[in-house]
Amino acid sequence: MSDTQNLKRRLAIVYLKEYFEANKHLPVTTNNLLDYLSFKGVFIERKTLIESIKALKVYGMDIQVEKGRKASYFYQGMKQEG
């Protein structure tokens, strides 16, 4: 993997944060997220995507998951402290 590709992969979490913030309260599928990252030049596997979403949740983003045949993610905002 080239240095540029490696850097872009590391940026995936930043791009995901931007995407969730721009689509607040809207259902977002795994394919939506992978397509957006692809548009940004970032190519990751689904497993890596799931781990990135978990990291964003730890960061404090309230991302709800609706499981089913096609999982949907809903960003509700930042979690409140307290």
Task: Please place each PLM-identified region on the residue numbering.
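Short, basic/aromatic recognition patches that contact phosphate-bearing ligands
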Residues: 1-82
